[in-house]
């Protein structure tokens, strides 16, 4: 919450509030059939409980609740008195057929003095009320820089916060373009003179003319147009607030009003979508230098057609993927992310060997009873292929996994060793080589793709989403010279599991091969610089990276869960702590994905501030392997 608080003088704070709590909340889905919208829980408490607590905290003495849908549940929460405040109820008998203009009009007998007028689906921090009441004698509207595309009433103010423009939806015909405007938060302080002379007369006229179908914003707007009253905009852009209309809003509000550790837990449970939450994502793995601007413009130009039309089925899409994989279409399986193929393989195959620590998806989908874990040893976490092959044979499995470069260690397996391993495990073992990050790796680490014809027991897996920087469209493929295996995998896929945006990306991608190669080189340089910066900090050992992320061991007093939390709490940076990985002492390891040079420098500076002390000599024999 924000510490820059604006305190109201006691005589500027109304002693009465009107809270609109009659709405259906239908956009919240099934819960709205058994719970009124203002009782939607946010951070463990109903929105209305937050609101009533804040009102009591600023000295409000009585609250008028306009109720309608499931009104008895509201009465059960608020009762006749709440936190020392007298509670009155006004019933809107037709909440399903009228809008909030009618609800406010029904409460008109309580609009005879200064009041807070608040909507019951808005959760906010207490300082919002203080900021509304900061100017004695002036009515005020709380407004904020938009949290999402503008919708609803917007306002403008001069440098002193005086309201200069109030634009409700009646003045928003055509394209909604109001640069510099603030979005109202549906939280008001209305002074008695404005209510009596402007608002109530406008409210009566509008309700008569619109038969309850309008919004009270119209009465505010019409009253302002008549002039003669002081109005201010309480800019709450730096304060926490959220209007909860749908489940996505509820998740956002939960996040905003939870303590930092719970916020971190919420984000980690999402496994993506972090861009909506105002954090820098160094947890998931990206190529931030691809797609280039020209490619993005091409994709944007076809947006309408791609959105409205069905994508192609598998055959033409597989041909596109085969072009990228440099294989024949019958050797390629295209899926909605490589994880989809992993899950299919888990159903079709028997027992597996998996080097650990590794990509958890293999262990999770195969199941503990069918996984034989091969422990990679610190400090370098390299895969000794002869020993691993012997382990595979002893285990009697039919499927063996290698991730190169490995996730989370960022350590790759040289191509010659992969080919040797394919021979050593024998033709009866399917060797799954996941090379989703190989494009970022230096020689001698390289793709086995050109040699699949000589190793028919190899299934190559590749995440297009990760390497090409398009995590939002979910694409991955498998390639193998065993066309019967490829056919079996394709048969497990639905006819339309690839969406139109993914198809359009595949169609355009071959025109940008050079740009992709350049992006990988840039990511490689970014990652080496990140590794070098982290290695120069006290108490940190960096495993030389072969991928677009850095695996670090914490050798000082701080553990990875604590460091990850401090990075989030203090700097809004997400990283991946590895205590959940199958490895001894996982709480000493942190994975940091590489982004732009500037973002990586922020991470290094943040870690330096947390671990303490000036940057010293590197604690590893060089942070990165030389390319070449």
Swiss-Prot record:
Purpose: Bifunctional cytidylyltransferase/decarboxylase involved in the biosynthesis of the phosphonate antibiotic FR-900098, a potent antimalarial agent that acts as an inhibitor of 1-deoxy-D-xylulose 5-phosphate reductoisomerase (DXR), the first enzyme in the nonmevalonate pathway for isoprenoid biosynthesis. Catalyzes the condensation of 2-amino-4-phosphonobutyrate (2APn) and CTP to form CMP-5'-2APn and then decarboxylates CMP-5'-2APn to yield CMP-5'-(3-aminopropyl)phosphonate (CMP-5'-3APn).
InterPro entries, alphabetized: Aminotransferase_I/II_large (IPR004839), MobA-like_NTP_Trfase (IPR025877), NHTrfase_class1_PyrdxlP-BS (IPR004838), Nucleotide-diphossugar_trans (IPR029044), PyrdxlP-dep_Trfase (IPR015424), PyrdxlP-dep_Trfase_major (IPR015421), PyrdxlP-dep_Trfase_small (IPR015422)
Family: In the N-terminal section; belongs to the MobA family.
Effect in UniProt of substituting residue 37 to A: Strong decrease in nucleotide transferase activity
Reported cofactor(s): Mg(2+); pyridoxal 5'-phosphate
Region span, MobA-like NTP transferase: 1-255
Key word Transferase present: yes
SUPFAM superfamilies the UniProt entry points to: Nucleotide-diphospho-sugar transferases (SSF53448), PLP-dependent transferases (SSF53383)
Domain of life the protein comes from: Bacteria
Reaction equations catalysed: 2-amino-4-phosphonobutanoate + CTP = CMP-5'-(3-amino-3-carboxypropyl)phosphonate + diphosphate; CMP-5'-(3-amino-3-carboxypropyl)phosphonate + H(+) = CMP-5'-(3-aminopropyl)phosphonate + CO2
Protein's recorded name: CMP-5'-(3-aminopropyl)phosphonate synthase
UniProt keyword list: Antibiotic biosynthesis, Decarboxylase, Lyase, Magnesium, Metal-binding, Multifunctional enzyme, Nucleotidyltransferase, Pyridoxal phosphate, Transferase
Pathway recorded for this protein: Antibiotic biosynthesis
Encoding gene per record: frbH
GO MF annotations, alphabetized: carboxy-lyase activity; metal ion binding; nucleotidyltransferase activity; pyridoxal phosphate binding
Modification N6-(pyridoxal phosphate)lysine occurs at: 466
Region (Decarboxylase): 278-628
């Amino acid at each position: 919450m924000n510490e820059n608080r604006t305190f109201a003088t006691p005589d500027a704070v109304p002693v009465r509030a009107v809270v609109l709590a009659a709405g259906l909340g239908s956009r919240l889905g099934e819960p709205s059939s058994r719970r009124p919208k203002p009782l939607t829980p946010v951070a463990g408490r109903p929105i209305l409980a937050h609101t009533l607590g804040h009102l009591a905290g600023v000295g409000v003495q009585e609250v008028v609740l306009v109720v309608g849908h499931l009104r008895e549940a509201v009465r059960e929460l608020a009762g006749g008195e709440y936190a020392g405040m007298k509670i009155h109820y006004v019933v809107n008998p037709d909440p399903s057929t009228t809008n909030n203009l009618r609800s406010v009009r029904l409460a008109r007998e309580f609009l005879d003095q200064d009041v807070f007028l608040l909507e019951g689906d808005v959760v906010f921090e207490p300082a919002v009320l203080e900021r509304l009441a900061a100017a004695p004698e002036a009515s005020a509207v709380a407004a904020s820089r938009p949290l999402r595309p503008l919708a609803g009433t917007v306002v403008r103010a001069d440098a002193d916060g005086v309201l200069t423009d109030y634009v409700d939806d009646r003045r928003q015909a055509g394209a909604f373009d109001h640069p510099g405007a603030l979005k109202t938060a549906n939280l008001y302080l209305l002074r008695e003179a404005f209510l009596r002379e402007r608002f109530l007369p406008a409210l009566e006229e509008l309700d008569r003319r619109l038969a309850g179908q309008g919004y009270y914003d119209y009465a505010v707007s019409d009253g302002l147009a008549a002039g003669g009253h002081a109005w201010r905009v309480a800019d709450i852009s730096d304060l926490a607030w959220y209007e909860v209309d749908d489940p996505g809003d509820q998740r956002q509000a939960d996040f905003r009003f939870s303590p930092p550790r719970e916020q971190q837990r919420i984000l980690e449970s999402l496994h993506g979508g972090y861009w909506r939450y105002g954090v820098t994502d160094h947890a998931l793995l990206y190529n931030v230098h691809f797609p280039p601007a020209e490619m993005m413009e091409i994709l944007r130009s076809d947006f309408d057609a791609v959105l409205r039309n069905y994508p192609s089925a598998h055959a033409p899409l597989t041909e596109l993927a085969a072009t990228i994989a440099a294989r024949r279409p019958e050797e390629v399986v295209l899926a909605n992310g490589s994880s989809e193929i992993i899950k299919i393989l888990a159903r079709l195959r028997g027992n597996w060997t998996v080097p650990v620590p590794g990509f958890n998806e293999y262990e999770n989908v195969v199941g503990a009873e069918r996984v034989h874990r091969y422990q990679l040893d610190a400090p370098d976490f390299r895969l000794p292929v002869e020993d691993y092959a012997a382990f595979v044979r002893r285990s009697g499995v039919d499927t063996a996994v290698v991730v190169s470069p490995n996730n989370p260690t960022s350590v790759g397996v040289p191509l010659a060793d992969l080919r040797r391993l394919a021979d050593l495990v024998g033709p009866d073992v399917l060797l799954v080589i996941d090379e989703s990050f190989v494009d970022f790796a230096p020689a001698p680490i390289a793709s086995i793709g050109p040699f699949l014809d000589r190793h028919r027991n190899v299934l190559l897996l590749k995440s297009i989403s990760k390497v090409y920087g398009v995590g939002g469209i979910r694409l991955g493929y498998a390639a193998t010279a065993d066309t019967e295996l490829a056919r079996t995998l394709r048969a497990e896929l639905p006819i339309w599991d690839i969406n139109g945006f993914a198809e359009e990306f595949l169609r355009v991608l071959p025109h940008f091969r050079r740009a992709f190669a350049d992006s990988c080189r840039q990511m490689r340089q970014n990652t080496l610089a990140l590794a070098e910066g982290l290695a120069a900090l006290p108490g940190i050992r960096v495993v030389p990276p072969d991928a677009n992320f850095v695996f670090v061991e914490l050798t000082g007093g701080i553990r990875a869960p604590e460091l990850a939390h401090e990075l989030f709490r203090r700097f809004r940076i997400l990283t991946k702590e590895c205590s959940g990985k199958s490895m001894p002492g996982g709480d000493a390891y942190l994975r940091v994905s590489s982004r732009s040079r500037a973002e990586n420098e922020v991470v290094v500076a943040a870690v330096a501030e947390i671990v303490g002390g000036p940057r010293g000599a590197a604690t590893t024999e060089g942070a990165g392997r030389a390319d070449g």
